[in-house]
Amino acid sequence: MKSEIHPDYHYVIFNDLASGEKILTRTTANSDKTAEWTDGNTYPVIDVEISAASHPFYTGKQRIMDTAGRVERFNARFKGFGGKK
């Protein structure tokens, strides 16, 4: 393998702003903001707006959209549009 062609892969704390959950993982992303983790070490912090800890799909709080009514309403509105001349 060639040396010095791979990006710096290091530990980072991802902070979910929606839920307050913090996740320590590895990434190539950088940040100037730092925080101390439970192991006593200081790591860069990257704020994310949403993660698996707060996304409705993963938390089970998702809404199911009723698309059948919307399709019927669309078809009723445009049923005569673009017909043969």
UniProtKB/Swiss-Prot annotation:
The keyword Ribonucleoprotein applies. Pfam families: Ribosomal_L31. GO terms for biological process: translation. The keyword Ribonucleoprotein applies. Signal peptide: none annotated. One of its GO terms (molecular function) is structural constituent of ribosome. HAMAP family: Ribosomal_bL31_2 (MF_00502). Belongs to the bacterial ribosomal protein bL31 family. Type B subfamily. Part of the 50S ribosomal subunit. One of its GO terms (cellular component) is ribosome. PANTHER family: 50S RIBOSOMAL PROTEIN L31, CHLOROPLASTIC, LARGE RIBOSOMAL SUBUNIT PROTEIN BL31C. This is Large ribosomal subunit protein bL31B. SUPFAM superfamilies: L28p-like. Keywords: Ribonucleoprotein, Ribosomal protein.
